[in-house]
Amino acid sequence: MKKSVVIPKNLSQKGKDTLLHAGFNLVELEDLSASSVIKTAPEASAIILMTEPFENFDITKMPNLKIIARHGVGYDNVDDDFWGKNGVYVTITPNANASTVAETTFAEILDLSKNLTATSNEMRKGNFDYKNSHRGFNLAGKTLGIMGFGRIGKQVAKLANVFDMKILIYDPFVKTTNIGSLVNREDIFSQSDILTLHMAVTEDNKAGIGSREFELMKDTALLINLGRGALVNQDELLEALREKKIAGAALDVFNEEPLPLNSEFYQLENVLLTPHIASNTKNAMENMAVDAANEVIKVLNGESPQWAVNKI
């Protein structure tokens, strides 16, 4: 009997084909909440999960489950420790989207530095003089602070180097670098003209960027968050943006997604908002789907996965 794999309905066809060629039965769902998966496919041996929260449940409800493969890098939507204790691997796809996220990070930095979206919106209203009171700034010579220096952070640093930016790095797990300078946490906030976040969310850093950090930042500084919404205290960020304690922000991730339409972020002119598009290219989606599928294949064939974030 074929083993079943639960997948998102919108998973790239290359990912689906990889699993089909390996001989698995696919259960395609739009709703990948734990309750939906248990109800629809309790016999499944694997789940490919995107960014939706996945609740813990009694493993006896899915006794064949061996792997939850995250389609992406972050895994704060699944309790890896809980599943490891229940004999289920949680895996990620760390090599699939680093360059894409770095490119999108710089697209948002460029947008803010040149007021592209704001100027385009005003032009559509017939306000051709908006540009005269909203001039941009050059990136060359500016200081880019990078918090989190993994695969994505390193790619961002390479791009910043091309723009002749000064690069500062904060990552407590990194001891040496051949690009930029390592600084302490306080200095990354106080010295950066643009600060970009590329860290995983942990219990230690959840909502760890707030009023104190915004007070340290220059009032001309920009915050770029394509990492995770939970890294930032969003109420305190709203206050900092309203009171111009920092000049602006580009936000691609939020505590609640989609961002509710009544969010005050929509009312602020100094914020660029995008709906979690950091890795939203055809190439990255295909890469993540195939890498997640290959992790499933390894585990269901009795092998160890390449990118597990937990132990069983």
Regions found by a protein language model. Give the residues of each.
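C-terminal helix-to-coil terminal segments
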Residues: 2, 84, 91-104, 118, ...
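N-terminal glycine-/charge-rich "phosphate-binding" loop or analogous flexible N-terminal tail
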Residues: 1-44, 164-168
